[in-house]
């Protein structure tokens, strides 16, 4: 089984059980791959909690998904991730840059509904 990276909103939707938000391809990829997240997702979840876009803590979300579906944090060297992110000049969003860069280090698929990522990262998938 290969590994697929999950964008932050995918992690939130999985935690909330919002499977109706997923495309058929997204559901298939989730069910047939190991699921990985960039550690920066943890920080983005904290930001979302602070601005009250979500109500659960990052640890609650990630621990629940780790236990329920085997979601795991990527352990790639952060220096390598940042150097890769420096090449992604199509976005000013640091979270999108780092999440995409983490996936790009190994040309891994990134599951996202983000239109900018889908337009610029060849391995981004949604539908």
In which residue ranges do the predicted regions lie?
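Short, well-structured N-terminal submotif of metal-dependent ribonuclease cores
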Residues: 1-37, 51-63, 116
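Acidic catalytic patch
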Residues: 60-89
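A generic structural signal for short hydrophobic patches within well-formed alpha-helices
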Residues: 11, 42-45, 117-118
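Acidic, PIN/NYN-like endoribonuclease modules and their adjacent C-terminal/linker elements
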Residues: 1-3, 68, 100-127
């Amino acid at each position: 089984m290969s590994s697929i990276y999950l964008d932050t909103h995918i992690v939130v939707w999985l935690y909330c059980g919002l499977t109706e938000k997923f495309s058929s391809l997204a559901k298939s990829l989730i069910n047939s791959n190991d699921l990985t997240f960039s550690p920066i997702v943890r920080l983005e979840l904290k930001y979302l909690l602070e601005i009250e876009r979500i109500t659960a803590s990052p640890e609650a979300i990630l621990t629940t998904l780790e236990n329920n579906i085997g979601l795991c944090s990527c352990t790639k060297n952060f220096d390598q991730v940042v150097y890769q992110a420096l090449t992604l000049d199509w976005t000013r969003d640091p979270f999108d840059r780092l999440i995409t860069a983490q996936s790009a280090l190994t040309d891994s698929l990134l599951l996202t509904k983000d239109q900018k990522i889908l337009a610029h990262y060849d391995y981004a998938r949604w539908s």
